[in-house]
Amino acid sequence: MKFVDEAEIQVIAGNGGDGCVSFRREKFIPLGGPDGGDGGDGGSVWLVADENLNTLVDFRHERIFKAQRGVNGMGQQMYGKAGQDKIISVPIGTVVINVQTDEVIGDMVRHGDRLLVAKGGTGGLGNMHFKSSINRAPRQARPGEQGEERTLKLELKLLADIGMLGFPNVGKSTFIRAVSAATPKVADYPFTTLYPNLGVVKIEAYSSFVIADVPGLIEGAADGVGLGMQFLRHLQRTKLLLHMVDISATADAYGNEKVGVGLLPIEQVRKLEIELERHDPALLDKPRWLVLNKADLMPQEEAQALAEALIAELRWTAPWYLVSAVSREGTWPIMKSAMTLFEHQREVAAEQRVSSR
C-alpha cells in the first residue's frame, strides 16, 4: 500500500431540521392550539483514531464527508429525528489542522480518541413554543440552524520511540531489519527507502518499543532537495534519535571522497546537523546517539581507530556505537541501552506528575 502522510478533506455537518407550523385538529375541537414539533438536530462529523490504519491513502479517493440533516418537526408535537453523525477513521498519530485558520484543533494519539470537527445545527422550534396570552394561534416556527463546515488538513506523525537519521545508503534499513521483524527494502543505491518504515523491537516478553526509519537526508534537504525533509515530522514524537554514519566512507589518494555514501564520516555528521538546524532545530535537542555502521568493511583495529578519531574530532559527548548492521554485530547493545533510557524517562515523567499535583 502506498504510504500517504498528508491529506486535505472537507467536512460538512448536517443542518438542523425546521420547526413545524401545525394546529391541533380533532373532532369537536375546532379551535385546537398550536402543536407543531421541533426539528431534529443535524448530525455532527467526528474523527476517531483507529490502530488498524497506518496511512491516509483512503483520503486520496474520498475527500468530502457529510453528516445527515435533521428531520423537520411534525404536527401533534412530534419532534423530528436527529441526523446521523458521520464517523471518519484516521490513523493514530494524525494531527488535525483547520485550513482556514491554520490552527491545530486536535492530535489523535490513542486508539479510540474522538474529535468533533464539525457540529451539527440545532433543530428549529415548532410553533407550539410561540403561543402566548396575546397570540393563541402563532403561525411562526424557527428554521433549523446550519451545520458547521470546515476544510481540514490531516498530517500523520508516526508514533515511534526511536527515529533514525542519516544520509542515503548508510544502512538504516539494514539496521532495522537486524533489530526488529520489519523487512524494509534494502539495496545498494540511494533512496531505497521511499516511505517511513516501522519496526517493533522486543527486548523481553513484555518489553518492546518502536523504531522508525525515514528516507535519508541529503545536503540541501532544507531547501527541498531529496526525499527526507518531508518525512521529518515523523521524528518529532520520538524519545531518541540514532544518527547513523557510514564509517567506511573514505577518500582516495587525491583527497576526493569516493567510497561509501560520498561523504567522509565527519561530513556526514556535520552536514546533517546543519540541515536539521535549518529545518527543525528541536530535533537537535532530543537525545541523539551516534551509530558508526559498516565496520565489517575494514579490519577491526582500523575501524576502532577511525571511530575513536572521529569521536575526538567531533568532541562527541553522547553515547556512540561501532556496529555492522549486515552481520548484526554491536546492534543489540544499542537496543538494550535504549530500553534503559526509556525506563528512566518514564520514571522521571512519573515523578514530575506526582510533584505537580
Curated annotation (Swiss-Prot):
One of its GO terms (molecular function) is GTP binding. It comes from the Bacteria. PROSITE patterns: G_OBG, GTP1_OBG, OBG. Residues 1-159 form the Obg domain. Residues 160-343 form the OBG-type G domain. Disulfide bonds: none annotated. Its main location: cytoplasm. GO terms for biological process: ribosome biogenesis. Mg(2+) binds at residues 173, 193. Its cofactor is Mg(2+). Its EC number is 3.6.5.-. GTP binds at residues 166-173, 191-195, 213-216, 293-296, 324-326. It is found in: Cytoplasm. Keywords: Cytoplasm, GTP-binding, Hydrolase, Magnesium, Metal-binding, Nucleotide-binding. GO terms for cellular component: cytoplasm. Monomer. An essential GTPase which binds GTP, GDP and possibly (p)ppGpp with moderate affinity, with high nucleotide exchange rates and a fairly low GTP hydrolysis rate. Plays a role in control of the cell cycle, stress response, ribosome biogenesis and in those bacteria that undergo differentiation, in morphogenesis control. NCBIfam families: Obg_CgtA (TIGR02729), PRK12297.1 (NF008955), PRK12299.1 (NF008956). Belongs to the TRAFAC class OBG-HflX-like GTPase superfamily. OBG GTPase family. This is GTPase Obg. It comes from Xylella fastidiosa (strain Temecula1 / ATCC 700964). The lineage of its organism: Bacteria, Pseudomonadati, Pseudomonadota, Gammaproteobacteria, Lysobacterales. The gene is obg.
